[in-house]
């Protein structure tokens, strides 16, 4: 449903139901081998604009689904994080309530800045200066056996995989808190991991000068995810 909600947020008329998308995807993946990892990208775009070609013309919508063979990342691959001078936007100045391509240039400059500092990704602040997410994924921290993740505040998307991790961890008996998280909280965490649809779980081994291990709860989060995925 997220792609249709995103289209509506961008004033684009969604034209394909979730059920129809699933049918198209199931037909498309028949062309791949069962051992291939297929990344699925449904997308809409406006074909015509109204006056000044800015506001999308309603009902005239392009749609496609991209199926791409992208191998799963090495489970031992870990990220390093640093801060960035760029922040997550707010609804008043961008479509933060949509999964939208127009948001990615901001993410790209976050990543580029982090890499010039010798890190693989950026830990990004919201408008208030608290932790929102990384440049590419949602963020979780672990402290004293409990799990914490930034509470959605309209500056980032609470991802599908993020929500699955929360459900899995709670069902497994862990306490999971959605709350305001500071950069100091991240520095003082026992474990840190990233959550995204492409990589599922990515351990974080450093935030600036602070180092972390790929700890037991990070590993358990990965196990729970794949147990859930294979159960279907």
Where are these regions (language model features)?
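Ordered, amphipathic secondary-structure segments that act as subunit-interaction surfaces
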Residues: 18, 34-42
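Helix-start/capping segments and mature chain N-termini
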Residues: 1-27, 45, 51-232
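Phosphate/pyrophosphate-binding loops at sites that engage ATP/ADP/AMP, CoA/4′-phosphopantetheine
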Residues: 28-33
């Amino acid at each position: 449903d997220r792609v249709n909600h995103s289209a509506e947020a961008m004033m684009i008329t969604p034209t394909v139901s979730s059920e129809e998308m699933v049918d198209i995807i199931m037909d498309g993946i028949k062309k791949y081998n069962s051992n291939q990892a297929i990344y699925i990208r449904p997308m809409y775009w406006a074909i015509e604009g109204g006056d000044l070609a800015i506001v999308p013309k309603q009902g005239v919508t392009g749609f496609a689904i991209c199926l791409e063979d992208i191998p799963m990342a090495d489970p031992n691959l870990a990220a390093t994080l640093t801060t960035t001078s760029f922040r997550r936007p707010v609804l008043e100045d961008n479509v933060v309530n949509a999964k939208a391509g127009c948001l990615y240039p901001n993410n790209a400059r976050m990543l580029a800045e982090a890499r010039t500092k010798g890190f693989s990704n950026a830990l990004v602040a919201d408008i208030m200066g608290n932790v929102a997410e990384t440049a590419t994924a949602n963020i979780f921290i672990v402290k004293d056996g409990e799990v914490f993740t930034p509470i959605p505040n309209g500056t980032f998307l609470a991802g599908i995989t993020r929500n699955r991790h929360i459900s899995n961890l709670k069902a497994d008996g862990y306490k999971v808190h959605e709350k305001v998280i500071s950069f100091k909280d991240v520095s003082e965490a026992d474990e840190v991991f990233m959550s995204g649809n492409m990589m599922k779980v990515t351990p974080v081994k450093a935030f600036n000068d602070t180092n972390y291990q790929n700890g037991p709860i990070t590993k358990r989060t990965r196990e729970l995810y794949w147990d859930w995925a294979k159960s279907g």
